[in-house]
Amino acid sequence: MSEKSSRKERDEKTEKETARQGKHRRIRVKSRHYEMPFSRGVLARSLTAIGVEPHKAYEIALKIKEELQDEGIEEISTDELADIIRTKLEEIDETLAERYELWRRIKKREEPIIVLIGGASGVGTSTIASEVGHRLGITNVIGTDAIREVMRRVLAEELYPTLYESSYTAWKRLRYEPAEDPVITGFLDHSEPVVVGIEGVVNRSINEGIHVIVEGVHIVPRLIKKEILNYPNVFVFMLAVEDEEAHKWRFYARSRDTKLSRPAERYLKYFEEIRRIHDFLVEDAEEHDIPVINNEHIDETVDQIVSYISSKLLKGERELSKSVSWW
């Protein structure tokens, strides 16, 4: 073997060894505040949060890692990495890329985002809240029914009898003859102590910087303090189901799918009262300039809520937040 051939063989081995070492070299991700190793798991989880299927999220994460290693990159900033991720998502679906940008903006914020989703029984507040939380990467989702249970433990039934009824039967426990619609009067009396608990959750979230979504029938605009409704980081929505027959059908579907302790018949027995509360909440929301969304299709409702929040964040981002870097 000639000296020239030997040199060529050594060079090829060196290149292969260098490439092999590059494949196993750790990539560091840096921001102004921290440095950490690149993690496919962390990246994949951030992608699933915006709706990418888990297997696809890991494929994208692996591909990005391999490309960085092939280019011999040992250090990359979070912003540079985010640009690469967005480009990959744009190749798949522009909507996913937009969701990723929104998710990043929310994660950057030091000030929390609080979403309140109201609506009468059966309009789908819990389903929509869960989907919005998944889309925005907000894991804290609280139902007002849970807050009501806490308030029941704090406030005696003798003092607040309507609190111990359902929102649509509270009128039965009124201690006086109401001048107006007893169903609405009872509902408001029932909701007042729950709203105190809702305001407590919102104030704590603001003070501690915790993103949260609160959903349920007790989100009554006229009962919530104006400073909370007007707080720039609080987003309030009211859900409706305009078609009464569609609203009725939802109780049957929910009872069948979730094995509720209360069968559909109980809700349908008081359907007239539920619809009166439904219409009252819609009117109250409109009077307070709160978006009312006809919840016919889950995806469309979620898109409307997320788009509204996104546009508001973009409009007031400079005034509302100080950014730190996240993936």
Swiss-Prot record:
Composition skew (Basic and acidic residues), residue ranges: 1-20
Listed PROSITE patterns: ATP_CONE
Keyword tags: ATP-binding, Kinase, Nucleotide-binding, Transferase
SUPFAM superfamilies: P-loop containing nucleoside triphosphate hydrolases (SSF52540)
GO molecular function: ATP binding; kinase activity; phosphotransferase activity, carboxyl group as acceptor
EC number from the UniProt entry: 2.7.2.16
Cysteine disulfide partners in this protein: none
Occurrences of domain ATP-cone (ranges): 25-111
Keyword Transferase found: yes
Entry's family note: Belongs to the 2-phosphoglycerate kinase family.
Matches recorded under HAMAP family: 2PGK
PANTHER family registered for this protein in UniProt: P-LOOP NTPASE DOMAIN-CONTAINING PROTEIN LPA1 HOMOLOG 1
Function: Catalyzes the phosphorylation of 2-phosphoglycerate to 2,3-diphosphoglycerate. Involved in the biosynthesis of cyclic 2,3-bisphosphoglycerate, a thermoprotectant.
Name of the protein: 2-phosphoglycerate kinase
Species, as recorded: Methanopyrus kandleri (strain AV19 / DSM 6324 / JCM 9639 / NBRC 100938)
Phylogenetic classification of the source organism: Archaea, Methanobacteriati, Methanobacteriota, Methanomada group, Methanopyri
